Amino acid sequence: MPLSTVFLLALFLILVVIVVILLARTAVFPIDTAEVEPIELTQVDGESVAQRLGLAIQLKTFSSPNLEEIDPIPFRGMHNLMHTLYPMIDEKLDKEIFNEFSLLYTWKGSNPSLEPVCFLAHLDVVPADEAEDSGWKYPPFSGIVAEGYVWGRGAIDCKGVLIGQLEAVDNLLREGYQPLRTIYLAFGFDEENSGRNGAAQMAKALQQRGVKLSFLIDEGGAITTDQIKAVSQPVAAVGVSEKGFVTLRLHAKTASGHAAMPPKRTAIGALALALATLESNPFPQNLGVVQFMLSHLGKALPFMQRMALANTWLFGGLVRKQMASQPTMNALTRTTLAPTVINGGHTSNVLPAEADALINLRIMEGETREEVFQRVNNMVADDVISVLPSDAETLQESRSWNPSPVSEVDSPQFALLANLIMAAYPSTLVMPILVAGGTDARYYAPFCRNAYRFSPFVLSTEETANVHGVNERLSIANCAKAVGFYMELMRHVSSLTAEEEAAFLSEDEWEEDEKPVKERKNKAPRASKVVEPEEVLIAELHTPLPTKPLKQPASQTVAYPKQPRQVESPTEEHLTSRSENFVEDLQPLQDDDEPLTVKPMKRG
C-alpha cells in the first residue's frame, strides 16, 4: 500500500475518532429535565399589590456603611407602613429588631424538630437622580402606578420582593395556614452597603441560637425572555453562589512640582499606567461555571453551542473569545476588575504629589480576596504605586468577602424550587447561576446548604437594565404572580417532612443501582464528564435529580379591597405625597461596555 494512501487512511481514522469524541461528549452534555405539570397560582389582585408597593417606594430608605449616617425617619416609616398594611403579621409572628432597622419575623412551625426555612429581602434602596432632566418618566420616589407598572426606585430591587413576601404571608395567615417548619422572614436595611449591620447581625443571632436552615431564598436572578439569544424559551436564573467582592486603592506618591518641569514619572501618569496595565491584563478565564450553567438548558441550547461547550479541549479558544466579548458572560468566566473612582490634582499648572484610584473586583469562584490582592500588587506595586484595601488597613477588616459556598442543586429543596418555577411559569427552563453581585444570602451560608437567589419576576432585558438605573419599574402582572409564587413556595418548603426529604435523596439512587445498566433512566451526567481536567466547576460537579411532581394545593382566590388599605397617621407623616406631575420620557443613559484595548506600557 502506497505511503500516501496509508497517510490518508490514518488521517481519516483520526478524523473519525475526533468526530466520535465530539458527538459523544455533546450527547452527554445537556442535563434534560422531566416536564412538570402546570399549576394555577392563587389569584391575586395585582393592582392592589402594586398600590401597596408604591407606598413602600415613596420612602427613601437609603443605607450607609456607617449607622450614624443613616436617616432613621424613612426606615421608621417603612416599619410603620408594614405594620399598617399587614397588622396580622405583627399579631401572629414574633418580631425582633436588630440595629434599629432590621426586622426578623418568626412564624413558628408545628414541628420544631424540623429545620426552619428563611425568606430574605432588604428595606434599603440605592439613591436616584430626582432632577427633572434625569430621564425618569415618572419621579423615582412617586411610586405611581401607570401604564401597567409601578414606577420607582426599589420596585425590583428589592421592595417588590419584600412586598411580595409580606403579601404571601398575610394571605396564608388569613387562610389559616399553619406551617410544619418554622418560617423566618429576615429583612435587612443595608444590603446595598454590604449588609454588615443588617443581615450579618440577624444571621449571627440565628447561628448563636443553634439554628440550621433547611432552605433560604433571597433576591437574585429572574425569568428573562431575551437575554440568552440562542434560546427561545424563558430562562429562570437561580443563583446558587455569588462572587466575592473587594475594592482596592491604588496610591501614587511622587514629589510635587511645577508642570513646566515635570519629572520622568508623575503621580497621575504612574497611576494611569497602572490602571492601563491592569485593564490590559485581565484575570484568567475559567469556563467551568458557564459549562455548568448552560448544561441545564438541555437541548434548548443549539447543537453547535452544545458541541463547543462540551469540547473545550478543541473549541476552548473560540468559547473563551466569545465569552469575553459579552460583559454579562465575561463576568461569569473570571474575576473582573473595574476602576470606579480616581482623584488627583487641583490646578492645571501644579504637579500633585499624590493621586488615588479605586478599583472594584468581583472575585470568581475558586479564588480568594487574598489571591486577588496579591495579583494586583505583583502587577503594579513599585516605589511609586502602592496597593491598599480601600477602607481599612487590612483585607480582613475591609468591606470585602470571598465567594460564597455553592448551594446544592441535587437536593429536594432545589428540586421543589425548580419544579415550582417550571409549573408556575410553563415552558420556562431553570438554570443555576453564579450571581455577579452581592446579596444578604451569603451571611447565612455557614448554617444553610440550600441558599438560593431568585426573584419571581418575568423581565425583559430593558427592565433588568433599569435596576439601579433610570425608570426602574415592575409590572402589575409581576406583582400579582410573585405573591402567588411566594405563597406556593412557602407552602411547599415549609411542609417538607423529614421522611419526604430522605425518600427524595435515596429513591432514585436505589432504583438506579438495582437496574441493569441498559435499563437505567437517562440520568443527567455529572458536569465533570464534559470539562477539561484543569477546569474547576462550580457546585463541585453536582448532578441534579429528576424532577418530581408538585403537590397541587386547593386553589383559593384572595379577596382584596379595590383600594389599597389606608395608612395610619404615624406612617403618613413619613411618606411623600404622590405627584401626578412627571417629566417627559427621555432616552435612558447607556453604559459603554466596550473593553479597553490599551496594552501594557514599558516603564522608563
Which functions belong to the PLM regions below?
Residues 8, 12-153, 174-180:
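Acidic/His- and Gly-rich active-site-bordering loop/insert found
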